[in-house]
Amino acid sequence: IAGCQNVVLCSPPPIADEILYAAQLCGVQEIFNVGGAQAIAALAFGSESVPKVDKIFGPGNAFVTEAKRQVSQRLDGAAIDMPAGPSEVLVIADSGATPDFVASDLLSQAEHGPDSQVILLTPDADIARKVAEAVERQLAELPRADTARQALSASRLIVTKDLAQCV
């Protein structure tokens, strides 16, 4: 889609098996164990182990976004995708939802940064309670639990009158 002949991937260590599998499916030629603004700098300027690239795309926290912005403004800078703001997600869950899956969806955004916003809308108070319990269980295993907790402090689980009110 981006028109690149060579595709590289940077991800902080340890790189999850799921990421490695997705990279293989997408034809990624090189993978580097580096993340954050450091990865952006390595990709933008090249390093002993990471090649300089023409385009830098992908998610990241506020530091990554700022690094990408700075790189893109240089005359010799790499092209970037749209600068990202805080992560956000709104999940609508009915009585058939799996609380563990809903909790994972919420936490996948909450862990991006303390300014992330996650919201659950559901007409089922039991689902809301079970999702809240699942979030707490999963937080215990989450490497970025402190960041996710900060985001969750400003997030909401809202029980509505019915599913139509969620929409």
Curated annotation (Swiss-Prot):
Homodimer. Binds 1 zinc ion per subunit. It is an enzyme of class 1 (oxidoreductase). The keyword Membrane does not apply. GO terms for cellular component: cytosol. GO terms for molecular function: histidinol dehydrogenase activity; metal ion binding; NAD binding. PROSITE patterns: HISOL_DEHYDROGENASE. Its cofactor is Zn(2+). Pfam families: Histidinol_dh. Belongs to the histidinol dehydrogenase family. Its EC number is 1.1.1.23. Catalyzes the sequential NAD-dependent oxidations of L-histidinol to L-histidinaldehyde and then to L-histidine. The keyword Cell cycle does not apply. Zn(2+) binds at Q109, H112. Coiled coil: none annotated. Pathway: Amino-acid biosynthesis; L-histidine biosynthesis; L-histidine from 5-phospho-alpha-D-ribose 1-diphosphate: step 9/9. Keywords: Amino-acid biosynthesis, Histidine biosynthesis, Metal-binding, NAD, Oxidoreductase, Zinc. It catalyses: L-histidinol + 2 NAD(+) + H2O = L-histidine + 2 NADH + 3 H(+). It comes from Salmonella enteritidis. This is Histidinol dehydrogenase. SUPFAM superfamilies: ALDH-like (SSF53720).
